[in-house]
Amino acid sequence: MAPDSDPFPEGPLLKLLPLDARDRGTQRCRLGPAALHALGARLGSAVKISLPDGGSCLCTAWPRRDGADGFVQLDPLCASPGAAVGASRSRRSLSLNRLLLVPCPPLRRVAVWPVLRERAGAPGARNTAAVLEAAQELLRNRPISLGHVVVAPPGAPGLVAALHIVGGTPSPDPAGLVTPRTRVSLGGEPPSEAQPQPEVPLGGLSEAADSLRELLRLPLRYPRALTALGLAVPRGVLLAGPPGVGKTQLVRAVAREAGAELLAVSAPALQGSRPGETEENVRRVFQRARELASRGPSLLFLDEMDALCPQRGSRAPESRVVAQVLTLLDGASGDREVVVVGATNRPDALDPALRRPGRFDREVVIGTPTLKQRKEILQVITSKMPISSHVDLGLLAEMTVGYVGADLTALCREAAMHALLHSEKNQDNPVIDEIDFLEAFKNIQPSSFRSVIGLMDIKPVDWEEIGGLEDVKLKLKQSIEWPLKFPWEFVRMGLTQPKGVLLYGPPGCAKTTLVRALATSCHCSFVSVSGADLFSPFVGDSEKVLSQIFRQARASTPAILFLDEIDSILGARSASKTGCDVQERVLSVLLNELDGVGLKTIERRGSKSSQQEFQEVFNRSVMIIAATNRPDVLDTALLRPGRLDKIIYIPPPDHKGRLSILKVCTKTMPIGPDVSLENLAAETCFFSGADLRNLCTEAALLALQENGLDATTVKQEHFLKSLKTVKPSLSCKDLALYENLFKKEGFSNVEGI
């Protein structure tokens, strides 16, 4: 049986599509004309849908806006507890025989059990009249069924989050319609099933959700079975990850699935001003979790744990708070139905005593989303937005390297705001187009980039904009671009991804421009580091900054870390006489980082169950590219294979390369018909790429000088006059030095000479 087919394929299959944003909260079932005719349904008829994953939902039949057959869209506003419509990954289609037209007579009275927002407890905890009014408003003109749950639409105001239908008359019918004459009452017994919360889509968090679900659902649902088996289950879980990746959202979703009462507390909010107040607040929160556990499984979520439990030092108040939390965590292990979940973006700042078994037994790391995960997140966010069919979410995912879930939400919100402002002038119904997302990119930067040292917002450069150097371009693509884009082929051939590349050659030969083009083609982060970013008057600060740069680059992978003019940052250790030179210490840190660059176990994201997910894991590394025009002063340990695997010589352009560079430089320049780029290329021997661009600039300025500001063309005579003033920056002696530099050293990884 195909994994996406219905288990009862006796009827026509309808493909289950995501709900249109305009139909949220309407309780509609969108069907094609053929399906409506087969059911004999009229507009607004009540339809009961039996779901493949169990449960059912009650909707009203409505035609699809595009009139297409073979598709179905559901709004499960009224469904049985635990029913899963859009969350199923194993089934993507429904048999038409699962849709049943049911009678829906008006109801005289209905009894409901309300689920209040903010976990207010029993209905009597708040004004009964206000709760009853909110329940009547939620049920008005809706078909309902006994035992089903009516969930408030997303974003709807009011006290009530959901209503359990616990009674109604007449009861023999499978469904009934709540009319203005229907008497709604609060009564009955609360259902034994977990009180539902609005479904939280987990775009890009599936693997972390599986890990957390495994740790939480077993002790919460099967505590006695685990005790009988003699298994000690973890009572505490620590979530670690950068801000905005969805730690809180993940906990809420898993708590909903496990049917647990969630008590979410921000740790900084527990801080008190007077002595002992913080400890008192912490004890009160744990006591509240125990009270909730008396009614069923309870989950205590402590956000920003590093603010509450930093590493203990000489400050007595912090030590007392940490000791109190440790005592309460040890006591919570005796409460079988209380699970404590902590979240932090600084796990190293926590006191080590918290992270031992028996307290926070397990740690679940949520990293910056990968390409596949960003696409899933964008699909979840835009499913509620009217986006144009021209918007390519895959392309947006490629453009959002380093964006976390909160950044992507802000990006979509900014695009929606731009579309709204644009629609006031052109149309009544705003539609988010590709241009709106491009405008939003100007205002929304990824949060993981905001504190990165040396991060550059580079101007995109295409390979075609770099004249000549075809052999060098191919070598760079093979060394860096191919491993990022075709990792499966590399593994099949037994190849490993290079860790680093050294570009060396005369000044002005496009070393930096080549790296910019490489970063553009690979769609990766680009971090450029110079000596000014590293060196500090304080001892040990430079080494710390370099380690921080590598750590931040790994958090923004795939990334290219560009060490421009590396000779000014590092030197050869043999040239240091004191043995404690700062460049020598920085070199030591760089060598250690190069040996350790790659995918750490705690940073792993995605799985290897498919080729695309394997590519996500393979790309979790930082590519080091260094550039210098003085390779003779570099330490030989840096140049061995395994660190800077490839040493590529960037030669000055030959005749063909100079002609290509001149064409690129004069592409936007109004040159006259008498200009012969072929002759200019022949006359510019020993000119670097920077020299040729300077030559074209001087010729254009000379044309303005001779013909005034009204000059329209640059003629051949202007180029010839500029040749008399612009001299080449290279010589035969310089070229011979670069070409023979590594030959005598015997390096096997030098290319391009």
Curated annotation (Swiss-Prot):
Keyword terms, alphabetized: Acetylation, ATP-binding, Cytoplasm, Cytoskeleton, Deafness, Epilepsy, Hydrolase, Intellectual disability, Non-syndromic deafness, Nucleotide-binding, Nucleus, Repeat, Ribosome biogenesis
Positions binding ATP 1 in this chain are G241, P242, P243, G244, V245, G246, K247, T248
MF terms from GO for this chain are: ATP binding; ATP hydrolysis activity; identical protein binding; polyubiquitin modification-dependent protein binding; preribosome binding
Q: What is its EC number?
A: 3.6.4.10
One annotated Gene Ontology cellular component of this protein? cytosol
Localization annotation: Cytoplasm; Cytoplasm, Cytoskeleton, Spindle; Nucleus
Protein's GO biological process: autophagosome maturation; mitotic spindle disassembly; proteasome-mediated ubiquitin-dependent protein catabolic process; retrograde protein transport, ER to cytosol; ribosomal large subunit biogenesis
> InterPro entries attached here?
AAA+_ATPase, AAA_ATPase_domain, AAA_lid_3, ATPase_AAA_core, ATPase_AAA_CS, P-loop_NTPase
Record PROSITE patterns? AAA (PS00674)
CDD domains per UniProt: RecA-like_CDC48_r2-like
Q: Where is this region: Disordered?
A: 171-203
Q: Where is this region: Required for interaction with AFG2A and CINP?
A: 1-189
User: Where is the major localization of this protein?
Assistant: cytoplasm
Tissue-specific expression = Expressed in both neurons and glia during embryonic and adult stages of brain development.
Q: Disease linkage in the record?
A: Deafness, autosomal recessive, 119: A form of non-syndromic deafness characterized by mild to profound sensorineural hearing loss. Sensorineural hearing loss results from damage to the neural receptors of the inner ear, the nerve pathways to the brain, or the area of the brain that receives sound information.
- Family affiliation: Belongs to the AAA ATPase family. AFG2 subfamily.
Q: What does this protein do?
A: ATP-dependent chaperone part of the 55LCC heterohexameric ATPase complex which is chromatin-associated and promotes replisome proteostasis to maintain replication fork progression and genome stability. Required for replication fork progression, sister chromatid cohesion, and chromosome stability. The ATPase activity is specifically enhanced by replication fork DNA and is coupled to cysteine protease-dependent cleavage of replisome substrates in response to replication fork damage.
PANTHER family attached to this UniProt entry: AAA-FAMILY ATPASE, ATPASE FAMILY GENE 2 PROTEIN HOMOLOG B
Q: What name does the UniProt record give this protein?
A: ATPase family gene 2 protein homolog B
Taxonomic lineage per UniProt? Answer: Eukaryota, Metazoa, Chordata, Craniata, Vertebrata
List the gene name. Answer: AFG2B
